[in-house]
């Protein structure tokens, strides 16, 4: 994470805390018990004050940013005052918003120019709670999503693709369509092989080649139902061609890289590339040197 704003970066974020009330088994940045809330709050307020006014977007992340409590709203109001044209992307597990009073406090900051990204790991409560390592996570996250919708916020639903989540991707798509049709975006996200993913390799790691059928079915059905679905963090060479148009260049510039053979690939300019931070990559990586017409 940077401590300054780079106007040319695709990943300007305010890091609120390393603490989290989830302990997700594939977390790329494992939580800490260190109390860094005060220090980071003061630092972030200064970063916002010195940020260029033409900044397009600014993320708020952690850990879990809502652990900042009411000071989260102070920070957001400060952003809106200093950077009125900047889009705010708040990443949260959503659980704090199960308290409608907390959701309404965020609403008082204004619902414009703010997108809230929340992960949902499964349509099955047991799977979601297992991944989050908390028995209340699924219920509180769902209630948080509903409360944010009632307050008028745009929500990005995030699904991190791993061995646990991939087995039920088609069912997950159906669950989203029936229960969460109001979400603005659905982001299906490839796994970054670092942090807890390394520790829990046998539980969470799956080569993207192995879940392409499930990913294709889920993605195409969500799109057919009129929902805005995208695929993050998976290079074109491991995706079915039918999914290329849903793939976006999503990896933060400071941890984005391409293999040497990617220079030979016809799709490099459209491809997200690879996580430089990942200790393991798909066996399917290869340059695309020929594109057959459908």
Summary of predicted features, one role per range:
Residues 28-39, 53-68, 80-98, 110-142, ...:
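Core AdoMet radical
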Residues 4-41, 268:
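Canonical Radical SAM [4Fe-4S] cluster-binding loop centered on the CxxxCxxC motif
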Residues 58, 113-116, 139-201, 210-236:
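Conserved C-terminal portion of the radical SAM core fold
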Residues 46-66, 286-294:
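Short Fe-S-cluster ligation motifs
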Residues 240-294:
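Flexible mid-to-C-terminal extensions adjoining Fe-S/redox cofactors in radical SAM and related proteins
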Residues 77-80, 167-183, 239-256:
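Short, electropositive alpha-helical surface patch
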Residues 70-77, 98-108, 167-175:
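Distinct, well-ordered alpha-helical segments
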Residues 1-10, 228-254:
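Short, charged low-complexity linear segments at domain edges
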């Amino acid at each position: 994470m940077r401590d300054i704003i780079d106007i040319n970066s695709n990943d300007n974020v305010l890091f609120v805390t390393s603490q989290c009330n989830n302990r997700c088994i594939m977390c790329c940045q494992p939580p800490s018990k260190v109390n860094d809330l005060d220090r980071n709050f003061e630092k972030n307020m200064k970063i916002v004050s010195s940020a260029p006014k033409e900044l397009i977007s600014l993320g708020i992340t952690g850990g879990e940013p809502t652990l900042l409590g009411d000071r989260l709203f102070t920070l957001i109001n400060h952003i809106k005052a200093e950077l009125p044209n900047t889009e705010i992307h708040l990443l949260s597990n959503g659980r704090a918003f199960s308290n409608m009073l907390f959701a309404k406090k965020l609403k008082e900051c204004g619902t414009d120019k703010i997108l809230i990204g929340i992960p949902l790991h499964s349509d099955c409560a047991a799977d979601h709670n297992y991944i989050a390592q908390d028995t209340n996570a699924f219920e509180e996250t769902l209630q948080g999503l509903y409360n944010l919708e009632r307050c008028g916020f745009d929500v990005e639903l995030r699904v991190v693709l791993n061995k646990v989540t991939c087995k039920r991707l088609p069912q997950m798509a159906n669950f989203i369509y029936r229960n969460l049709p109001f979400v603005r975006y659905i982001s299906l996200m490839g796994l970054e092989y670092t942090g807890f993913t390394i520790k829990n390799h046998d539980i969470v790691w799956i080569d993207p080649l192995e879940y392409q059928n499930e990913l294709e079915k889920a993605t195409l059905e969500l799109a057919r139902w009129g929902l805005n679905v995208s695929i993050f963090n998976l290079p074109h060479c491991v995706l079915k061609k039918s999914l290329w148009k849903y793939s976006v260049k999503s990896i933060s510039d400071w941890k984005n890289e391409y293999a040497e053979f990617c220079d030979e690939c016809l799709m490099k300019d459209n491809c997200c590339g690879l996580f430089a931070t990942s200790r393991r990559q798909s066996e399917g990586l290869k340059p695309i040197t020929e594109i057959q017409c459908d």
